[in-house]
From Swiss-Prot:
The lineage of its organism: Bacteria, Pseudomonadati, Pseudomonadota, Alphaproteobacteria, Hyphomicrobiales. Necessary for normal cell division and for the maintenance of normal septation. Belongs to the TRAFAC class TrmE-Era-EngA-EngB-Septin-like GTPase superfamily. EngB GTPase family. One of its GO terms (cellular component) is cytosol. This is Probable GTP-binding protein EngB. GO terms for molecular function: GTP binding; metal ion binding. PANTHER family: ENGB-TYPE G DOMAIN-CONTAINING PROTEIN (PTHR11649:SF13), MSS1/TRME-RELATED GTP-BINDING PROTEIN (PTHR11649). NCBIfam families: GTPase_YsxC. Keywords: Cell cycle, Cell division, GTP-binding, Magnesium, Metal-binding, Nucleotide-binding, Septation. SUPFAM superfamilies: P-loop containing nucleoside triphosphate hydrolases.
Length: 217
């Protein structure tokens, strides 16, 4: 049952993402990051977990974030800026866990991710995307540990829910909640989404609207 407060947050989230969102910056290195401004929310996850697709679903713009079938294609921190009165940025982080890229490039991308997480005061939260079909892998655990150690708030978003049976999805969600209890920087609520069907997208928008509102007070 949706309460009045829930409905209000969902409407706030809808309005936030109904505004004009646009690409503003691409950073291949920590030295080329844009100046910190407003509230930043980042999306992290394994290669092809659906980060770009979810950003497109959130904003309702199918081509805002470029998607690729090639793992590891996103090699930079990609910044998108929302409506001017919102003072919010989304950050599409390089996918991790790709096996086909050269080791030197993997090391470079990994270093960029870690340095960004450790030194970005404007970063309100990292949404760590997990493929619902596979659950949390060792490489995801390593990122969660990095976030814990750097005291960066993060929340798990399970993606591609349309490709998993309902019973399996419920089990995966509960197993994820249980695992997160061991991680001090993790927000306890697990969000379940499908960029293809739109399932869970209004709830993610609402969660982000609440978070952004708290940081702008």
């Amino acid at each position: 049952m949706t309460t009045g407060a829930d409905a209000d947050l969902i409407e706030r989230g809808r309005k936030l993402f109904a505004g004009d969102w646009q690409f503003i910056w691409a950073s291949p290195s920590i030295e080329t990051l844009p100046p910190m401004a407003g509230v930043e929310v980042a999306f992290a996850g394994r290669s092809n977990v659906g980060k770009s697709s979810l950003i497109n679903a959130l904003t309702g713009r199918g081509t805002l974030a470029r998607t690729s079938r090639t793992p590891g294609r996103t090699q930079e921190l990609i910044f998108f800026e929302g409506p001017k009165d919102a003072d919010v940025r989304l950050v599409d982080m390089p996918g991790y866990g790709f096996a086909s890229a050269p080791k030197a490039r993997i090391a470079s991308w990994t270093s960029l991710i870690h340095k960004f997480l450790l030194g970005r005061a404007s970063l309100a939260r990292v949404y760590v995307l997990i493929d619902s079909r596979h659950g949390i892998k060792d490489i995801d655990q390593a990122i969660l540990t990095t976030l814990d150690r750097s005291a960066v708030s993060y929340q798990i978003v399970l993606t591609k829910a349309d490709e998993v049976k309902a019973t399996e999805m419920a089990e995966r969600t509960e197993a994820t909640r249980t695992l997160l209890a061991k991680h001090p920087a993790a927000f306890p609520d697990v969000l379940v989404t499908s960029s293809r069907t739109g399932y869970g997208v209004p709830e993610l928008r609402a969660a982000m609207a609440r978070l952004i509102g708290e940081h702008q007070r």
